[in-house]
């Protein structure tokens, strides 16, 4: 996921401003930029709506680049996982399918305990969303996650398809 995350930075709200030679240059068509901005705004809205502490909400604009990179990295990693395991039937282990284990491994990377004061500090100053929201904000945007866990509209983390983030 980390490699996909870093690759995706080349096409996030900041990276997209640089051309193939690393020069700051607006190389996107007006229509492409408009569509990207519209789709990125969906991501901003998702993270703006997360209440990280009572009365305190995430800053989707400030964390946009990292959230896009998390989203893209997760998609790239899942596609690589499926391609790498396509020829080998992986077993169910401890009641979990390989796909479920993939998403649980992603979630495990971001599991942490931080003090309430640090939640407030990071929400105001860090361009990365808090670990919990790098999971709970990202996974409901990924169709394969719904399939892996049989998520339905009755589940609390369900997001209708037409409301999910789709940058590319």
Which residues fall in each region the model found?
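Short alpha-helix carrying the canonical HExxH Zn2+-binding catalytic motif
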Residues: 1-11
């Amino acid at each position: 996921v980390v490699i996909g995350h870093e690759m995706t930075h080349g096409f996030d709200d900041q990276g997209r401003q640089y051309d193939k030679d690393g020069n700051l240059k607006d190389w996107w068509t007006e229509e492409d930029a408009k569509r990207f901005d519209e789709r990125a705004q969906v991501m901003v809205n998702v993270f703006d709506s997360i209440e990280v502490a009572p009365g305190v909400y995430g800053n989707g604009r400030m964390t946009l680049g990292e959230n896009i990179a998390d989203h893209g990295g997760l998609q790239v990693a899942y596609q690589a996982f499926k391609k790498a395991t396509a020829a080998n039937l992986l077993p169910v282990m401890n009641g979990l399918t390989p796909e479920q284990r993939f998403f649980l491994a992603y979630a495990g990377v971001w599991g942490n305990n931080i003090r309430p004061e640090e939640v407030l500090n990071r929400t105001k100053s860090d361009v990365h969303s808090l670990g919990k929201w790098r999971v709970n904000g990202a996974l409901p945007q990924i169709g394969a996650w719904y399939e892996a866990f049989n998520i339905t509209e009755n589940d609390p983390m369900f997001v209708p398809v037409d409301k999910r983030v789709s940058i590319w």
